[in-house]
Amino acid sequence: MLKKTLLALAFTSLALAAFAQQTGIKRTPLQKLEFPDGYNTVTAIAEVPAGGAAGRHTHPGVETGYVLEGELNLLIDGQPEKTLKAGDSYQIPAGVVHDAKAHGDKAMKVLGVYIVDKTKPLASPAP
């Protein structure tokens, strides 16, 4: 019985650690438009602290971004890792698992535009 309890506690700790990593991103919505039909176009500032990560996640629509400050490692499933710096832009197709990690000792900040299915959340955690 003790073994099962310890195992359950270990799995719970891992799940909480994974959740904490996924909440490393702070999104500040700037504008939300109900356009085109059935979609929301959301413009937001996304920030990850130095040494932090957004956590693996997806969006129910395309994401286009522009790096405002800092550097980041962009990890998109099925693609080689990319290092982006202020002034660089990127695109991520709908439903593709990705993560962004602040590179170096500075926080990173991006301007993101998301065109997403309005019946779904802006972002969902991915395994």
Predicted segments — roles?
Residues 119-127:
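Short, low-complexity, Pro/Ser/Thr/Gly-rich segments in the mature regions of secreted, periplasmic
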Residues 23-55, 113:
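A short glycine-rich, His/Asp/Glu-containing loop-to-beta-strand
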Residues 15-18:
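N-terminal signal peptide c-region/cleavage motif recognized by signal peptidases
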Residues 55-61, 96:
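Histidine-centered catalytic micro-motifs
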